[in-house]
Amino acid sequence: MAVIHCFGVGLVGSYVAKRLAQAGHEVHAYDPKPHRVIGIQGIEIHLLEPGEDPVEVMVRDCPVDDGFAIDLVVNMLPGSIGHASTTALAASPWRTIDLSFSEFTPDRDDEKAREHGASILWDVGIAPGLSNMLLSEAYRDFGSLKKAEVRVGGNPTEPTGGWNYMAPFSPIDVIAEYTRPARVIRDSAEVTLPALSEKHIIEVPEKGDMEAFLTDGLRSLLNSIPVIEMSEYTVRWPGHIQMFIDKRDSGVLDEVDLQSQWQYDSKTPEFTWMEVMAEAFDGRRVTWTVQDHGSDDGHSMGRCTGLVAYCCIIEWLEDPDMLPPGVHAPESLPSEVISRIINMMLDEGVEIIGPMTSHS
């Protein structure tokens, strides 16, 4: 049994915390609104007051002098709040998994982490996360790539009218995703393009036409995979992003209203779909597709994101030396670890089609 501290128990965080508790681990949950895990056996709740630092609360509530153990910290607080926690954790000799997906990536704390003996694995969701792992496998097989593309989205299973969308994560983070310029690779160099550009129609099996547009999701891949052209596109039902653009350009976009209008509704069927493609210079091409419609244990995007993180946690607990001190992106994980993560997700009912899905 390990002692694991979960910062943030929202849709994704609660999934991870519950899975860890069900596996017999001692889980400490830190959140200002921990309602999703109240009453769950094996989870001790630490209520965060507004503005409180979860790292300080963790050390205060479980002092080291009293035999306090930190086997692993899982930071699932969103955006800048989560980034501040990971930066603080980089100054302590603990293992951390970072799922904050902040604009300010934790690789900037690599030197600090090495100095203090901290090991941080970041962005281990579905995309970024599993997408990085798959592209790293393509790079290991092909060498430098000619082209790489990721298309991913969590959406209602069919158009619902209006926005045709509900946010599986914080709507504020989705708005940030739609406004932050997209960093991509063109002619082997990093360039910045306007968010939501390169809008195009794609066909998603069993769903029909959907719309893809550039977003800033490559992150660590910008510096880790040698490639001529690389892009990440978010996928939505047609009309959704044009409605956002029209309201934004006309000055009537109200972020407070969006948070209400995009609120997740557990009664609405939804699915997550991802396609990862890599092309070699000799013409070889590999494609993976990932699809999930959720299950009794959670909605699809939260489940997929949480499953990748959960699998990484299990791997790291079984091999404490899996990663040395420093800050590590998901593509730095060994092939055998990636293979086991894929198989664990398959065992959980996530559909993954492509190479490495039957390796032991």
Give short role names for the model-derived ranges.
Residues 73-88, 103-105:
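Beta-loop-alpha module in the N-terminal Rossmann-like domain of NAD(P)-dependent dehydrogenases
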Residues 99-120:
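Rossmann-fold NAD(P)-binding glycine/threonine-rich loop
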Residues 4-8:
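Conserved N-terminal Rossmann-fold NAD(P)-binding element of oxidoreductases
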Residues 12:
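Hydrophobic/small residue at the entry helix of a nucleotide-binding pocket
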Residues 71-76, 96-98:
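N-terminal Rossmann-like NAD(P) cofactor-binding module of classical short-chain dehydrogenase/reductase
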Residues 20, 89:
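Aromatic pocket-lining residues of Rossmann-like dinucleotide-binding sites
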